[in-house]
Regions:
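Phosphate/nucleotide-binding beta-alpha loop and adjacent structural elements of enzyme active sites
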Residues: 2-342
Length: 342
């Protein structure tokens, strides 16, 4: 009898334990279910809140196109210019990579105009070649400069180091052109003389070094693309560059940042007695680099119309007398695809 009672008690305890475990399991399942359901509801609410905003954004995006569809013209598309990292070097003039071969090709190239510029009969006599020396403009009616000067809508940039010859700048300013001269050696920060503005600003091929305090700089330093942007100028009819051996790196920067499209006429003084600022490599590589830069101009639709070898300069080509070549040339390039705006 006692054994039966003991057995029943043990059975009841086991049954109660099983029931307790079962109830605990059910509670856990119910809790998990409630939590999951709550998460699903929260996600659904968030999705509903975000959906109207997305629809609104799409509607706003479509609005300009819808407005443009009611007009005759498509909206203007602004394409961001993609800057290049380096220029395309031309093949060597000869397999031997010889300086003489490179120099002959280069000198032949800069001495052979690619287009002729006829001076229109209506042009002022002051624009004759004899009156402003080596800096010759292209006033051919096939291009835009003559008309821009006559309408007094021309803009001129002159990049220089010290005032040696500003006759062309003053001539263009006197003809009604808007002339900006950038020279770090002038006294005042910004000076104006009739249609001629003088800016104490150095045009560089690099951005200013942030480690150098502005107080230590005698003049500001900017790239030409930044100056155009700051001044709100989209185009320049004439760009004159006389930077005493910095012209190579400046030209490279104009090519890489695609500023050439904004220039109608390029007047460039070359200094050949040494490689130039920050131009590295052996002598054949230097001349190949020079030639490649000018070929980049040609690919940008510029054509050489004027070449002047200065007879008063030393006969030096990379520190040596090479074919009695002058160390200084002035080249004139016209952008055959330049279309003035405004």
């Amino acid at each position: 009898m006692r054994l039966q009672c003991t057995f029943r008690k043990r059975m009841n305890k086991c049954l109660l334990l099983r029931v307790s475990l079962l109830l605990s399991l059910l509670c856990i399942c119910a809790h998990v279910y409630v939590e999951l359901k709550g998460l699903c509801l929260t996600a659904a609410v968030r999705l509903q809140k975000q959906t109207p905003n997305r629809r609104h954004q799409k509607a706003v995006t479509r609005t300009p196109l819808a407005d443009a569809a009611s007009t005759c013209c498509r909206p203007l598309k602004h394409h961001r210019r993609i800057h290049r990292w380096k220029i395309d070097l031309e093949p060597w003039a000869a397999e031997t990579h010889d300086l003489q071969e490179e120099a002959d090709r280069f000198l032949r190239y800069i001495s052979t105009p690619q287009v002729s510029c006829e001076r229109p009969a209506s042009a002022l006599p002051v624009f004759d070649r004899e009156d402003h020396g080596s800096w010759v403009l292209c006033l051919d009616r096939r291009f835009s400069l003559a008309e821009r000067i006559e309408s007094k809508h021309c803009r001129v940039y002159s990049l220089r180091l010290g005032v040696e010859d500003d006759g062309l700048e003053r001539l263009l300013a006197g003809s009604g052109c808007e002339v900006h001269c950038f020279d770090p050696s002038i006294r005042g920060a910004h000076l104006q003389d009739a249609h001629m503005w003088l800016h104490r600003l150095s045009v560089d091929w690099r951005d200013p070094n942030p480690a150098v305090p502005a107080q230590r700089l005698h003049s500001g330093t900017k790239k030409l693309a930044a100056i155009l942007n700051d001044f709100g100028h989209r185009q320049v009819d004439v760009l004159k560059v006389d930077l005493e051996s910095a012209e190579w790196k400046i030209l490279e920067n104009l090519i890489l940042e695609q500023v050439l499209d904004s220039i109608g006429l390029l007047l460039l003084e070359l200094h050949l007695h040494w490689a130039g600022f920050e131009v590295g490599g052996d002598e054949p590589s230097v001349v190949r680099y020079w030639f490649s830069l000018l070929r980049e101009l040609e690919r940008a639709h510029f054509r050489l119309y004027h070449s002047y070898s200065d007879p008063t300069k030393p006969r030096l080509f990379l520190h040596r007398n090479l074919r009695n070549t002058s160390s200084s040339f002035v080249l004139g390039w016209v952008n055959t695809q330049f279309v003035p705006q405004g």
